[in-house]
């Protein structure tokens, strides 16, 4: 028996100001798969009142679930909130090549860098991103508060934005949506191995800077794609103006009601808080290790 649960919620007009109901947007997302590409047979769930070991997850199941949840829908946004690599022998053996190949089967609209993307330094990250860029997807790599030193970091062959962008803008059914990437700064500097010259800026100040830049250009539908932890995301949402959705990672947080399976959740999916404008912000995260797709 395989457990592979898709958390279901459509981010519709009521959650993104100015989007008409006819232009409903579906966001599919994962985070923190950490090179866990095979299904896991060690999970125990409460099924029918009995503790049952099940086979769960795996990146092929991620791919098929993305395909299933995308079928018949015209406006689908596919997001990865970081820590794609390190944590399993697949990374030890293939240094991100296997992860990149399977990520390109999903073809994400954006990928935010996490702290573990820097475990092998800027050069190791370049190696992984080169694998990712070999596919036909050309997924934008986002980290607005990460600034590699031009001319010194391997991430800057020609400029500081050769590999990493602060944001991307996508058009879904005529909706222009700005997606801004934020990495967890202090944790990345202190527990990973970025180059010493690579800067990590304040998360809140950087997010607001690029929200303001996008809204000044008439792009009013803003998503933060963060690798910043669930509780930090909740606080971040309340400090910012102009943000509508935060899709996060790093804390490996399970949201939603899974009590019937014996799993503990950290909150509702999505968790809704008010931003500094008094508008609703949906904060979501999709657990860990290729186990869940958030919708």
Regions found by a protein language model. Give the residues of each.
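Acidic, metal/ion-coordinating pockets
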Residues: 22-295
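Gram-negative bacterial Sec-dependent N-terminal signal peptides
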Residues: 2-21
């Amino acid at each position: 028996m395989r457990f592979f649960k898709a958390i279901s919620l459509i981010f519709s007009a009521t959650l993104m100001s100015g989007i008409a109901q006819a232009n409903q947007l579906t966001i599919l997302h994962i985070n923190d798969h950490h090179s866990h590409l095979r299904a896991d047979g060690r999970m125990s769930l409460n099924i029918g009142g009995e503790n049952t070991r099940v086979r769960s997850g795996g990146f092929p199941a991620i791919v098929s679930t993305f395909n299933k949840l995308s079928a018949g829908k015209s406006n689908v946004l596919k997001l990865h909130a970081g820590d794609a690599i390190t944590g399993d022998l697949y990374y030890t053996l293939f240094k991100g090549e296997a992860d990149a190949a399977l990520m390109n089967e999903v073809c994400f609209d954006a990928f935010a860098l996490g702290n573990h993307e820097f475990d092998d330094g800027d050069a190791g990250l370049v190696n992984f991103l080169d694998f990712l860029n070999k596919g036909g997807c050309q997924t934008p790599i986002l980290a607005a508060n990460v600034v590699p030193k031009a001319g010194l970091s391997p991430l800057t062959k020609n400029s500081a934005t050769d590999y990493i962008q602060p944001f991307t803008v996508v058009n879904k059914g005529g909706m222009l949506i700005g997606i801004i990437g934020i990495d967890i700064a202090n944790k990345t500097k202190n527990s990973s191995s970025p180059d010493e010259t690579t800067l990590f800026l304040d998360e809140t100040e950087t997010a607001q800077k690029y929200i303001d830049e996008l809204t000044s250009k008439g792009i009013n539908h803003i998503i933060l794609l963060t690798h910043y932890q669930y509780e930090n995301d909740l606080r971040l949402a309340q400090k910012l103006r102009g943000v509508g959705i935060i899709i996060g990672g790093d804390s490996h947080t399970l949201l939603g009601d899974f009590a019937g399976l014996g799993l503990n959740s950290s909150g509702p999916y999505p968790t809704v808080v008010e931003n500094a404008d008094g508008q609703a912000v949906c904060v979501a995260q999709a657990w860990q290790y290729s186990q869940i797709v958030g919708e």
